[in-house]
Structures are given as C-alpha cells and as structure tokens.
Amino acid sequence: MKRSMYAGRVREEHIGTTITLKGWVSRRRDLGGLIFIDLRDREGVMQLVINPEEVSSDVMATAERLRSEYVIEVEGFVEARQQANDKLATGMVELKVSALTILNTAKTTPFEIKDDVEVSDDTRLRYRYLDLRRPEMLENFKLRAKVTHSIRNYLDDLEFIDVETPMLTKSTPEGARDYLVPSRVSQGHFYALPQSPQITKQLLMNAGFDRYYQIVKCFRDEDLRGDRQPEFTQVDLETSFLSEQEIQDIVEGMIAKVMKETKEIDVTLPFPRMSYDVAMNSYGSDKPDTRFEMLLQDLTVTVKGNDFKVFSEAPAVKAIVVKGNADRYSRKDIDKLTEFAKQFGAKGLAWVKVTDGQLAGPVAKFLTAIETELSSQLKLAENDLVLFVADTLEVANNTLGALRNRIAKDLDMIDQSQFNFLWVVDWPMFEWSEEEGRYMSAHHPFTLPTPESAHELEGDLAKVRAIAYDIVLNGYELGGGSLRINQKEMQERMFKALGFTADEANDQFGFLLEAMDYGFPPHGGLAIGLDRFVMLLAGKDNIREVIAFPKNNKASDPMTQAPSLVSENQLEELSLQIESHD
C-alpha cells in the first residue's frame, strides 16, 4: 500500500478519511481489550487503536505480536480522540486500524528511543542509527537542513558560484596536523585531506570567478573537545575586489536571513565591532560572550607600591567582581576555582569578599591602605566577591576570562534566549608559540597585513597587525576571515617572517607564488563553522548533536570501529610498514 502521509502530520481536517501510515512502534499498550499503538515516523507520533470487535482475527494476532521498534504498515479510519492529548501535535485524532502488516521486527534496543534518555555517549554512538530516531535528534537535522538551504539561497541570489575543491591536496606547514593519505601510484608520497580550501579558493579568485562559495568538509588532526571534530563542515566564501566592510556586510545579511528563517529572530544590523585588544583586556577572550557583564578590571596601577609584593611586583594585576554572590562561595568552592585557574597558568587566586561594608578574606589585610580606592574603582557593594590574578598580562587575561565564563554558567547568569553576534577585528598577525619557539600565523600565512604595520615584517613581528576579522556568537568563534595577500613580493616577505627559506617557500607554496605572477586580484573571504552554528541555534553544547555520524573524543567511531587495522597486502601496495611502539 502507498503511504498517504506522515503519521506526525495527521490533523483534525483528516477526520473521516481512510489513510495508510508506515513507521515504527514507539509504544504498545493493552487496555480493556483494546490495543493502543504509538506509531512514530520522522514527523511525530500518532495513536492507533485496534479494537478486537472491529478487526479480523489475523489483524488482532498481528497486533499482539508487536513490540517496540517493529516497522509496520497500517490502514485505518481517522477519528476524533475521546480524550485529547495536548502534548502531541496529533493529539486531537487517532487512527482506528482496519489492516496491519509487520514490515520488519526488531530486537530489544539498548536504550529507549525517547528524548532525555540516560545513556553513555559511546553507547549512543555505537548505535547511532537508533540514537538518530529520537525526535530531538531528528529536529536537529531538520534545523541543519533549513540552515544550509537558507545559506545556499542567499548566496545564489548574490551570484556566488558553488565550486567543489579537491579532497586530496598537498600537505603544507602551519595550522593543525594534517590527515595524510598515502599514494599507491607515487610511492612514498602522500596527499593531505584539506584543513580548509584556503589556497584553492584564492586560486579561483585568480581565475576570475569573483564570488565563490562551498559548503565543504574539512579535516584537522587535533585534540578534540565539545565544539571540535576531526572532520567538520564549513561555509566557505571568497570574493574579489571587495573591502573588509563589504565582506562583513554580506556575511551579516546571510546570518540575518538564517536567523529569520530558522528561529524567527530579527537580528540587529550591523553587528557590534570590538578590537582584539579590547576583547582580551575586558573579557579575557578573543571570542567574548557579551550576554553578561563581569568585565575584567585592571588594577596594576592601583596596587603599585602596595606592601603586598604578590601584587606590587607582578607585571599585571587584574580582577573580576562577582556581584552580590559572595555568600554562594565557601572557601572550599574558591579552592576549586583556584585549581581551575591554575590550568591557565596562574600561580594562584587571591580573593576578598565585601562583608558588613568591609573587605574580608585572606588578602584583605594587605589592601587596607588602598581599600577606598579599590572599592571605588571596582564599584564594590555588600556581598560582592573579588577574584584577583597577579601574573603576566596574558596569564591574567586568560585565567580571568575562563573564570568569568565558568562563574556565569555556575550562577545561571546567562540569558540562553539571546544570540549576541560580534565582530572581533584588528588582530595581531602573529602569535608566539612556546612549543615551536617562534612566531606563527594567528590565522594563516596568506592574511594581508595592515599598510601601517607591514614594515614590521622585517622588524618586531609582535607589532604587525592583520586585516582579519572573526565573527563571534555567544562566546564561540563562529568563523574567521581576512583580506588576502595578492602581491608576490608581500607573500614572500610573509613566508620569510615565518622562518621559511626561499627554497622552502617555493617547495611548499611555489604554485601559489607562481600564480601571483599572472594578475592576482585583491580578494578576501571568510569561513563559518556550520556544525558550530547549528549547535548554537539548536541550543546544544556539543557539535556531535548536529553531526549525523560523529567521532568520539578519541577520534574514533564506536559503530564502525574506525579507524581500523588494514591487511598486510594493503600496506605492501602502499610500501608502508607499521612499527610497533610497545
């Protein structure tokens, strides 16, 4: 029989009609001789009623065999329910079954197919096809489909060209580790799976495509966390002849369209802009969450000359004030915050509380001489908690930024209904890597430096600024972009500043440098993390919830057991040999 409609779409207007439905048995109940079935499909749940006085003995026998997750086909008459169920979209109607066929049986599932099920993440991933049956998960992927549909329509209307770029590319330095693919034909040589289509999309601008986009898979072999996966999807854009502001205008319009069409939210344009330095100094993060206050306060000048040497001799002293919540934090709680702070390089955490109008706590006695000035600068009031970090400016900012976010979550200070978009601009071109012992690109080595700072490529790299911009949403980096280098001489200077010899630069990026000899236009673009964007729109805290078949925190798939061993024959074909490190 042909399915008439989705079970979850049956409504009052269908009363009096005979329809055919197909789906899964969500639940079976026997009540007073009647059998009630909750039939589930991707659109929802519909109640079926099987009355032994109105169906054949064969139908009744089939109904008695039904168990959860059996796949069935039913035909019946739509009636009004005697008792409506306002928890279901189909709650005003039910289907009086006249015919029933079992299309497939099912074993007892390892967990219930319902929202809010308590089961380990690895079990969910091991049986991902069952996990995806849960209504909550289905809704996540309907949302994702709406987002990509909206993005494609918007960019198509602006005459962007959707171009696929290679999945087998050249391994290049900078950035995260590559996933490598050995070549059978060119033995000893390897492809890399792309971390982004960065260079190829720039070459498309050189080809005259003018406006490119792609919703593309990317790969990075890096440590995982809640908002990262080894393979992920990004909305990739590149344009020719546009300014930084023009590119941002396009992106803002795209996001506004997505928010309107998927969440029915009108976002205010243009988005606020904040410099990198302000973000770090006031929020302790280059991706600040602006849904709450608790800004970092610089006390370095205030405490200079103080008898408390931990403060007076530190390069920087900064603090955050937890307003009106000191009584929520016992000494044990603050000890936990101190251990948390040490993860970010802080040696410790000093603190005081405002109690009966006075500063109280382990360091209060050292602050007596500046108590009035301190209270005025921090605008202290009764029951405030002040947390201090005395260290380098970088450690103080990073530590207090992390504490700020943690405390806001602990105290439920964040309005989860808000979507605060923000541009972070005026980035440093380079960041110092302790691990590498050198400066590395803050974004990538193709970013255009500002005209005012480009001369420092041969001088103090810490002073070079980039024409780069990140878009931030609720404390997450949603995407990043920049204007790109299009002059060969500037690109060679950039490679040299990063420590490449001329031969190394030519070996790794010779094809790009050669392309710059053939009229490379000014260009720039941006990439947005699609998984992260959908995660935030869905109100989730892990991108696994919006990726159909994700990896776990060990970058493995419990369902398929990937990555897996391969045969000796396969290794021999590739001239590979695995060394044991036991």
UniProtKB/Swiss-Prot annotation:
GO BP term (any one): aspartyl-tRNA aminoacylation
InterPro entries in the record: Aa-tRNA-synt_II, aa-tRNA-synth_II, aa-tRNA-synth_II/BPL/LPL, Asp-tRNA-ligase_1, Asp-tRNA-ligase_1_N, Asp/Asn-tRNA-synth_IIb, AspRS_core, GAD-like_sf
SUPFAM superfamilies, per the entry: Class II aaRS and biotin synthetases, GAD domain-like, Nucleic acid-binding proteins
Source organism, top-level taxon: Bacteria
UniProt keywords, alphabetically: Aminoacyl-tRNA synthetase, ATP-binding, Cytoplasm, Ligase, Nucleotide-binding, Protein biosynthesis
Binding site for L-aspartate: E174, R220, H443, R484
Residues that bind ATP: R220, D221, E222, Q229, E477, G529, L530, D531, R532
Subcellular location: Cytoplasm
Pfam families: GAD, tRNA-synt_2, tRNA_anti-codon
rRNA processing is among the record's keywords: no
Region of interest (Aspartate), residue spans: 198-201
Disulphide-bridged cysteine pairs: none
This enzyme's EC code(s): 6.1.1.12
Molecular function via GO: aspartate-tRNA ligase activity; ATP binding; catalytic activity, acting on a protein; nucleic acid binding; transferase activity
Protein family membership: Belongs to the class-II aminoacyl-tRNA synthetase family. Type 1 subfamily.
Function noted in UniProt: Catalyzes the attachment of L-aspartate to tRNA(Asp) in a two-step reaction: L-aspartate is first activated by ATP to form Asp-AMP and then transferred to the acceptor end of tRNA(Asp).
PANTHER family: ASPARTATE--TRNA LIGASE, MITOCHONDRIAL, ASPARTYL/LYSYL-TRNA SYNTHETASE
Protein name as annotated: Aspartate--tRNA ligase
Species per Swiss-Prot/TrEMBL record: Streptococcus pyogenes serotype M1
